[in-house]
Amino acid sequence: MSTEPSEPAGPLAGIRVVALEQSVAGPLASRVLADMGADVVKVEPAQGDFARHWDSYVHGDSSHFVWLNRRKRSVVLGLREPADRAALDRLLAGADVLLFNMAAAAAERAGLTRERLRGEYPSLVVCQVTGYGSTGDARDRKAYDMLLQAETGILGLTGDDRGPVRLGVSLCDIGTGLYAATLILGALFERSRTGEGRFIDLSMFEAMTEFTGPNLTAFANAGVRYGRNRLRHHSIVPYGIFACNDGFLAIAIEHDAEWRVFCERVLDRPDAGADPELSTKRAAAGAPAWTRPGSPMA
């Protein structure tokens, strides 16, 4: 992390972001803004962002922290100290965006309430990221990627009959961070027309419902309950991982035109591509059979 802001460039040049952030979701959101040219001031506690201590793979620094915090400046503030609270207020007086990801009760103790921020900084765009929302019984629960994958139904769609498989990336953290950045950009655009800021209350739980949207919609409208489908798609075929002689092959065919090209150029089976029955019912037809170990396709 640099001690001075980089040369202004990009669509957000001139925008200052104050980010009270730890872990992944908040830091990723502010890093997206920094990549667009915003001047991001990262506020950390004395012990530093949690992610600083996750590993030491980048010249002694954490790979997660390096990935999430490029192009930012950093300052240490203890928000329980009156002098540091006053320093934060001075930062906010010159800021365009405030981003913070912490439990709702912790935010309230730090004075980061909707009422105060909207009253004292009416043009400030504020984005609060929590695990489960700022109200309700779950508002102060800690949110971890694994738990959210389970609670939002994502793990009900992975794996097979032997059980669920956690996604190999931190989907909930990353997805929420990107969602937060998008909402902040929208609020900045709105402010450019109205002069008014906005308070964005985003939970990781609700952000993850976007990833299960088709499943929720199918169930709500037709009672269809998608289950675990290993590496296949519920509606599109062939779309998955197929076994070959020397390993596995990823195939994704979305529509009939691609199916015809695939049959002609890859399978050397133009007749299959021209077969109307296979064209509409290709899932149950021959794709898995054509990719058995020892087949010509392998």
Residue ranges, per PLM feature:
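Conserved Rossmann-fold dehydrogenase catalytic segment
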Residues: 134, 161-169, 192-208, 227-234, ...
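Oxidoreductase and adenylate-handling cofactor-binding alpha/beta cores
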Residues: 177-197, 210-222, 263-270, 274
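Aromatic-enriched alpha-helical interface/lid elements that frame and gate functional surfaces
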Residues: 237-298
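Active-site-adjacent beta-strand anchor residues
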Residues: 78, 100, 201-205, 251-253
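Residue-level marker for the onset of beta-strands and adjacent loop->beta junctions
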Residues: 6, 64, 198, 237-238
